[in-house]
Amino acid sequence: MEYNNMMELKFLSKSQNESFARTVVAAFAAQLDPTIEEIADIKTAVSEAVTNCIIHAYENKIGIITIRAFILDNKITIEVIDEGKGIEDVEKAMQPLFTTRLEEERAGMGFTVMQTFMDELEVESTPGKGTLVRMTKYIGRNR
């Protein structure tokens, strides 16, 4: 597929890299002239996706997280990819409040947050191989 622009970023699954990742994606999205609310939505969704990689995919061990972002017309698609443990049942994992970590604050809300702040959300996962979260936001839709 042909895009207007694209970027790729790879970084270690360390919690201090979460804010870096969301800032890079927000800076890339800025070329679409989004509203402050649209940028905040994107940053929140990216934060959730990256945090899921750190906590669930790699279980606080070090691995590689890849973010790809693609711009086509007024649409930005963001992929957050890990090579961690994968998700056994994606449909179940996407249900609000489903969690494998009962002790965590806000547990079970990551995918719900991503769905709330983005226009489209897709999750592909293979147990033992990793997960790809694809989020899409249409910029300027409400103007």
UniProtKB/Swiss-Prot annotation:
It catalyses: L-seryl-[protein] + ATP = O-phospho-L-seryl-[protein] + ADP + H(+); L-threonyl-[protein] + ATP = O-phospho-L-threonyl-[protein] + ADP + H(+). Disulfide bonds: none annotated. It comes from the Bacteria. Keywords: ATP-binding, Kinase, Nucleotide-binding, Serine/threonine-protein kinase, Sporulation, Transferase. Transmembrane segments: none annotated. InterPro entries: Anti-sigma-factor_SerPK, Anti-sigma_F, HATPase_C_sf. GO terms for biological process: asexual sporulation; negative regulation of sporulation resulting in formation of a cellular spore; sporulation resulting in formation of a cellular spore. GO terms for molecular function: ATP binding; protein serine kinase activity; protein serine/threonine kinase activity; sigma factor antagonist activity. It is an enzyme of class 2 (transferase). Its EC number is 2.7.11.1. Binds to sigma F and blocks its ability to form an RNA polymerase holoenzyme (E-sigma F). Phosphorylates SpoIIAA on a serine residue. This phosphorylation may enable SpoIIAA to act as an anti-anti-sigma factor that counteracts SpoIIAB and thus releases sigma F from inhibition. Belongs to the anti-sigma-factor family. This is Anti-sigma F factor.
